[in-house]
Swiss-Prot record:
Species per Swiss-Prot/TrEMBL record: Trichodesmium erythraeum (strain IMS101)
Gene: dapB
UniProt-annotated location(s): Cytoplasm
Positions annotated as active site in the UniProt record: 164 (proton donor/acceptor), 168 (proton donor)
Known function: Catalyzes the conversion of 4-hydroxy-tetrahydrodipicolinate (HTPA) to tetrahydrodipicolinate.
Source taxonomy: Bacteria, Bacillati, Cyanobacteriota, Cyanophyceae, Oscillatoriophycideae
Protein name (Swiss-Prot/TrEMBL): 4-hydroxy-tetrahydrodipicolinate reductase
Pathway: Amino-acid biosynthesis; L-lysine biosynthesis via DAP pathway; (S)-tetrahydrodipicolinate from L-aspartate: step 4/4
CDD domains, alphabetized: DHDPR_N
Amino acid sequence: MISQTSTPVIVCGAAGKMGREVIKTVANASDMTLLGAIECQPEYIGQDIGELIGSGPLEVPILNDLQGILVMAAQEKQPAVMVDFTHPDSVYENVRSAIAYGVRPVVGTTGLSQEQIQDLAEFAEKASIGTLIIPNFSIGMVLLQQAAIAASKHFDHVEIIELHHNQKADAPSGTAIKTAQMLSELGKTYNVPNVEETEKIEGARGCLAEEGIRIHSVRLPGLIAHQEVIFGGPGQIYTLRHDTTDRSCYMPGVLLAIRKVQSLTKLIYGLEKIL
């Protein structure tokens, strides 16, 4: 059994780049204990997750059995947390299963539809289980979004460019969608056209998000995660940019989310809501 003062943590997507970083962080946190490492890639199954991340044995085998780990978690005296960095195709069922077993989900996987998020919110509230869906765990990105909100009061034209590694499955990124949503909630319409635009190639102007905001997605090897919010006005351009140079920048936000979700009784969307 895990110490009554230590939070049991399950990591889904444990062998992925973000999953490995989360494993290292949880293993080094004095108030957390790694309960399970879930991965669907067959070449990793059965390995000790500590050996995989290069930190030495942690005595936690990599499994492809979330259900079994959730059953174990439900038996712990201290409420468990599941951190999910998997794939848009699997995250919804993972989160529903965790809530059903009383395990608090912290979700970094993007690609959930608004309908899925709403369904999970209703399910979590009915079960009184804290759930966090966070498109971006970087404190710097939260500051960028806050600066964008401030700038939007003075500019009527804005576009978002998000750039990620070419292994990212969804586009646009959850962070870009979240940024556009935050700007759209300010009660104004952006980018009112001065001319009738024609796209010679479909998608050349990016995707049209809420309130006229356009989002452009770039996928290239060599990138990690980057975002620009570009405002334009007569005689000036104002550019906000955040660059992730190492995934370790997300870990303070992940730790905060794991600790915070335990006191919640409903779903919350966005890191800025718990800072």
